[in-house]
Amino acid sequence: MPTKAELEATITELEHKIRRLDRSLNQTRIDLAELPTAAYNRFETPHLNDNVREALTRASAEWEADVKDPSERINLYIKSCHGIGWSWEADYVKNGQIAWCGAFAAWCHTRVKFDIRKKIFPSCYRMYQAWGQTSRKIDPMKVQPGDIVVVYAAKRSIQGDHITVCVDNSDFGSDGFITTIEGNAHGTFPDGSYGEGVIKRERKLTEFAHVYRLVADDFDEQ
């Protein structure tokens, strides 16, 4: 058992360490205050261009429309020229009849050239083949609203398993999440209930397979 003198010496040493830590903490606070905001707030919401704003507006409108699977409205994503334009498909009347997550993303990004929406948006595989080796594939840590985020499901396919649209990255970080609006998925409806259709949910970085950001040449001229 330590003596009284030894304990007093330990207390004195700890008090010195606390004072040194206080000085270091105060200096760090001063240094932080002098930095521009952008130097440490790396997840600040960026300026959104018109194409991205339009996609986010359309995504939110579909979510607020409370589209539950199956729904006649899903035919618009699949068959109309504002979605993927697969007009030859049979009417969607049964849950699981076709995987339509990419068709929903195409509906949101309707300003993208029709040929791209028709040929690339319909599946994770098509996106990976067309964009996986291009500048559209970005660092997942740089995800922004409007980006197409392909996530893993149980299969964890190399191309990813499900297509989503990022609508908010304000809570993102290595331990945080983004908010997505998705079609053909389970999540939250506008009234807070849980179900399948056009839903909103949170996705963590560990779920990301690939993040794609469309480039200017992908859009129709306005």
Regions found by a protein language model. Give the residues of each.
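N-terminal amphipathic/basic helix or basic patch
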Residues: 6-9, 13-16, 50, 54-57
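Short, highly selective alpha-helical patches that border small-molecule cofactor pockets
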Residues: 7, 102-105, 164
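...with weaker cross-activation on analogous glycine-rich loops/strands in unrelated enzymes
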Residues: 115-190
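Short intrinsically disordered terminal tails
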Residues: 1-2, 143, 219-222
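Active-site signature of cysteine proteases
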Residues: 170-222
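N-terminal capping segments
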Residues: 30-112
